[in-house]
C-alpha cells in the first residue's frame, strides 16, 4: 500500500478536479451532470496495510511513496485510517516490542475494521508459527478485543473469527455484513453507504428480476434484492460466495439465487453455448430480467459481457475505473443512453475515483 498525500485543505479542490474529469469522460454520451458524494476528510479508510521496517533496533510501521519501494515513510499513526485503526496501532506496536514470539520475523501488518467498530488484525511472518506464537496471539487478541490471523507460507492460524461484522443503513433499513479477511471489501465505509443508497434509488421499485454480475460478498445484493422480484447473482471467488450466502441468511433475504460463475461463464450459459453443473436446478428461462447490475474489476466488462448487458432495459453500473466505464458505455451507446451518473469519492487524496451510471434503453 502506497502512502497517500494527506492534506484536508486541498480536499474540495481535488474533488472538483475529479468531478470535471468524470464530466469530460462522459461528455461524448450526453450524460447528465454527475451527482457528487464526498468523503469524510480523515479517518475514512477502514482497512490499511503496513510493512514493518527495522531502524534503531526497532520495527516501525512503514509505507512507501508511489514508485519508490526503497525509501520507507515511518509512521506512528495514519490519519486517513479509521479511528479504530489509529487506536490499535500503538498498542499493537507495544505488544510486538515486548514479545519475541510476536515480533520474530514479523514483516507485515494488515488492519480490517468496520463502521460498527469491529476489528481484525493479520500478522504476516517469514517463519512457521508455533505454540508460543499462538499463546502470545491469544493473549493479544483478548487485550485488544480483536480477532487475529497469523500468516506464513502454507500456514494460516485464526484467533477468534476470520471476518469482521459491518452494519450499513440503506433507505432506513440496516443490513449486516460479514467481511472476510483477505477478500475484497469497500475501503471507505461512509462512501460505500452512499453508493448503496444511490444504487437503491437509481434501480427503483421493480416487478421483474435483476441479474447481478461480480456480486462479491453481497454488498449491493442485499439492498437491491428488496427492489425486485428475484435476483440471480454471480461471483467467482469461493470466499466471497460463502460470505454472500451467510449475509443473505443473516438478513433474511430469500429471493436471491447465487451461483459461482464468472461473468464470461454466465454469458455462455445464457447464450446456451454450454451447460454448467453449478447451474443445475436453476431454470434460467424462468427469470424475467429487466435490469442488470454490474460492479466489475478495474479492467471493466469484457466485450462479450458488455454485449450480454445490452439485452436489458436498464444497466446499473458501478465502476472503480471511469476510463474503462467510458469504453463500455461507448460499446453500448447505440442502444442505451446514460440517464443518471454519480461520482463517489472512495479514495480521497488520490487520482482514483468511483463512478456510477444508469443506462436505459433508447
Curated annotation (Swiss-Prot):
It comes from the Bacteria. GO terms for biological process: tRNA methylation. S-adenosyl-L-methionine binds at residues 186, 214, 219, 235, 295. It is an enzyme of class 2 (transferase). It catalyses: uridine(54) in tRNA + S-adenosyl-L-methionine = 5-methyluridine(54) in tRNA + S-adenosyl-L-homocysteine + H(+); uridine(341) in tmRNA + S-adenosyl-L-methionine = 5-methyluridine(341) in tmRNA + S-adenosyl-L-homocysteine + H(+). SUPFAM superfamilies: S-adenosyl-L-methionine-dependent methyltransferases. Gene3D superfamilies: 2.40.50.1070, Vaccinia Virus protein VP39 (3.40.50.150). Its EC number is 2.1.1.-, 2.1.1.35. This is tRNA/tmRNA (uracil-C(5))-methyltransferase.
